[in-house]
């Protein structure tokens, strides 16, 4: 995982390098060939780098490192959405992953906000919110005593998956 972390750090530096966004390179590409232009990552690729970095740190059992990447990802998401909100969709998986890290760190307020944003992002996407994610988010918010947040999601109390239905009928928690 250490090598993966280093490689993603290099990729991020390359992406942030002013040379890759050079006006001279753009002008040369217009006059000659597009292949002269250095590759620039698309917004979803930038966010994917953060997803993998968070997963790398979690795999190493380095919660502090994962939390740093979560905070960096939040800054990157905000920057991307402010730059071009019409072209950039909210990233439900990254929001959900961030919520999990906040939850593991005991930062319940940040976790609740991230869970809420994850559900909203999934709902607004073509993919939709997986029932299992909604189950987990609902139970996490309930555990945090955030019934108002659950109601604000405008979803039924528990998603109708076989596991949730069986557990609900038995009167147990997930």
Where are the predicted features?
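Boundary/linker segments of alpha-helical solenoid repeat arrays
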Residues: 15-26, 78-88, 119-149
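TPR/TPR-like (Sel1-like) alpha-helical repeat modules
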Residues: 2-17, 57-58, 64, 68-75, ...
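A mature extracytoplasmic/lumenal domain signature
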Residues: 53, 70, 168-170
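Short loop/turn and low-complexity linker motifs enriched in small/turn-promoting residues
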Residues: 147-174
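Repeat-mediated protein-protein interaction surfaces in helical alpha-solenoids
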Residues: 24-38, 72-83
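Second-shell loop/turn segments in exported
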Residues: 35-40, 52-63
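"A position-specific structural signal for the A-helix of alpha-solenoid helical repeats
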Residues: 45-55, 59, 90-104, 136, ...
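Short coil/turn linker motifs that delimit alpha-helical repeat modules in TPR/alpha-solenoid proteins
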Residues: 41-44, 87
